[in-house]
């Protein structure tokens, strides 16, 4: 599935095995405690909704979504540092929301570092709300950092 954006030179498509080196490189450049190449490979093998944003013929961002039992979980979303603040993270998030709705998902969850104020602002803009806190969830230079748990309801309860 490809999604084209008329206002920017980018497409979103399903992640392929050949994309893993570029995805891993973006992850390493973006996080102090990155996912390994093997974790991304395992996400593909497990059949998670894994997608890449292509700009100028190169992977410029990626997102991974797990869907099961009427729920979805955003596992990872990241944009290459030089392409941030251009709306690509929002486009990846919109694609995940579209795919979740297409799978009849009721609720979509994610965890985010409270220190990641840019991501928190985007999630709130898209209708996510904080519902819980996971203590010491993330590795951090100063030990551990909590995670804010967010949810967005996609289908009203009947």
What are these regions (language model features)?
Residues 1, 107-113, 146-158:
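Conserved catalytic core of the tyrosine transesterase superfamily
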Residues 99, 122-126, 152:
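Alpha-helical structural signal in soluble globular domains
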């Amino acid at each position: 599935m490809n999604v084209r954006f008329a206002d920017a030179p980018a497409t979103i498509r399903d992640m392929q095995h050949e994309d893993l080196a570029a995805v891993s490189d973006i992850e390493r450049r973006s996080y102090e405690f990155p996912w390994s190449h093997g974790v991304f490979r395992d996400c593909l093998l497990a059949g998670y909704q894994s997608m890449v944003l292509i700009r100028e013929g190169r992977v410029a961002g990626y997102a991974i979504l797990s869907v099961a039992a009427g729920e979805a979980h955003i596992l990872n979303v990241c944009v290459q540092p030089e392409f941030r603040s251009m709306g690509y993270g929002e486009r990846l998030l919109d694609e995940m929301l579209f795919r979740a709705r297409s799978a009849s998902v009721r609720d979509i969850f994610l965890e985010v570092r409270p220190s990641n104020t840019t991501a928190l602002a985007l999630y709130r803009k898209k209708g996510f709300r904080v519902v819980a806190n996971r203590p010491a969830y993330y590795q951090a230079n100063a030990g551990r950092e909590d995670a804010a748990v967010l949810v967005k309801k996609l289908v009203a309860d009947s």
